[in-house]
Design a protein with these regions (language model features):
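Beta-rich, aromatic/charged-enriched effector core domains that present basic-aromatic interfaces
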Residues: 1-111, 285, 304
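Active-site-proximal binding-pocket segments
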Residues: 138, 142-321
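Short coil/turn segments at secondary-structure junctions
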Residues: 9, 215, 344-347
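Glycine/tryptophan-enriched, flexible segments
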Residues: 55-204, 310-311, 315-379
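A generic structural signal for short
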Residues: 13-14, 135, 219-220
Length: 379
């Protein structure tokens, strides 16, 4: 109103809280005689548009991927010409101030802005895309795009990426398109099932434990399992964590410590610079075995073998755990087998993975049988 605006243009917000906020903002604007115009969304295909033959949303990724590709998407928006900006009132400087608590960020953030995002995209295409399919699971290798924060905040649109990838048939390019589709899939699922933001899409009613001192050890990277601790320390120090390690750390919390996934998802969101609500919640549910397209409940990530497989030389572990920097090669994943493994203060394991795996499977099996029994009684 201060600048005489007649219309306010935004992109469509599809996450539950943002969508509710937009309804309130639209009502307030219209009451003031200002039109609210929502155009587009931060997705190649706006959530809710890809539907199955029955008109419903998909709950399994592979058929969604096929339908998403068939649906297609528009090309990137044409860059506008010179824009005439409104003259701001004299006291408008306060509009763009940043709260001091937010300005004093404890981590180093990636360069901001579209120019930086496009530069990173060009660098990824030229250096890492061809090997993306083989390197994306290796946390010690700079093999991922690191574009997630730019996508999250709308600095870069997925249609720009997809347009640049059109016609590229290599394994790396195709895998990258598939990973973009996972982001679209999770947003679509959340659109159709907003309650899945903080609760199980497919409830199993597993007997979980309340967060305790072991949960704090997990949050701080003091579990005694190197790959888990390296990931959690990377998260705290950089605001980012490698996707493979996100799965390993999530499995450890839900299957080894038996803590319900929303506790971990909340911790991730508090620290991730790319904290996407849909991808975060449904990624956690995939690991926990209670979401859409979920991993089978009996799949329990072994934090030792996962570390040895995806960080075979221990480089990632040594990078984030200085207490293990003296251990060469794969020995960094098993400090308990090395005479001086604990010489620099690395903590001992807080649980026995083998025993907790058995316990997790027993809890999930009891939940499965209980659900089956209830279903039979309802027949």
């Amino acid at each position: 109103l201060e600048v005489g605006a007649r219309e306010v243009h935004t992109s469509v917000e599809t996450e539950p809280g943002g969508a509710a906020r937009d309804v309130a903002v639209r009502a307030a604007l219209e009451a003031a005689g200002v039109a609210w115009v929502a155009t587009g969304s931060p997705y190649a295909v706006t959530p809710g548009r890809v539907r199955n033959a029955s008109g419903d949303g998909y709950r399994v990724f592979t058929p969604f991927l096929r339908a998403w590709r068939t649906h297609g998407w528009r090309g990137p928006a044409v860059e506008p010409g010179p824009l005439a900006l409104a003259n701001a009132p004299s006291d408008a400087s306060a509009w763009d101030t940043v709260d001091a608590a937010l300005a004093a960020c404890p981590i180093e953030l990636p360069p901001a802005g579209e120019e930086a995002a496009l530069a990173r995209w060009e660098e990824f295409q030229s250096k890492e895309l061809a090997r993306y399919d083989e390197n994306r699971d290796l946390p010690a290798v700079d093999g991922t795009s690191r574009l997630s924060a730019y996508l999250k905040f709308g600095v870069l649109h997925p249609r720009t990426l997809l347009a640049d990838l059109a016609g590229r048939q290599g394994d790396g390019a195709q895998r990258f398109i598939t990973e973009l589709a996972w982001r679209e899939f999770y947003a679509d699922v959340l659109h159709h099932h907003p309650g899945s933001l903080a609760s199980d899409l497919n409830p199993l009613e597993v007997a979980y434990d309340e967060p305790d001192a072991r949960f704090e050890a997990w949050r701080e990277g003091r579990t005694g399992y190197p790959i888990v601790d390296a990931g959690m320390r990377q998260l705290l120090a950089s605001g980012w964590i490698h996707n493979r390690v996100r799965m390993i750390t999530a499995s450890f919390l839900t299957k080894d410590l038996h803590v319900w996934w929303p506790h971990g998802a909340e911790h991730f969101l508090a620290h991730l610079i790319d904290g996407d609500l849909a991808s975060n919640s449904h990624g956690w549910q995939w690991v926990a075995g209670t979401g859409t397209d979920a991993a089978p409940y009996f799949r329990v990530f072994n934090p030792i073998s996962q570390g040895e497989r995806f960080d075979p030389d221990g480089e990632y572990v040594r990078r984030w755990i200085p207490e293990l920097a003296h251990l060469a090669g794969a020995a960094a994943h098993r400090p308990w087998q090395v005479p001086d493994g604990y010489a620099h203060g690395y903590p001992v394991r807080i649980v026995d993975h083998a025993a907790e795996r058995v316990e997790a499977l027993a809890r999930y099996e009891r939940a499965r049988l209980s659900r089956s029994d209830r279903a039979r009684r309802q027949l």
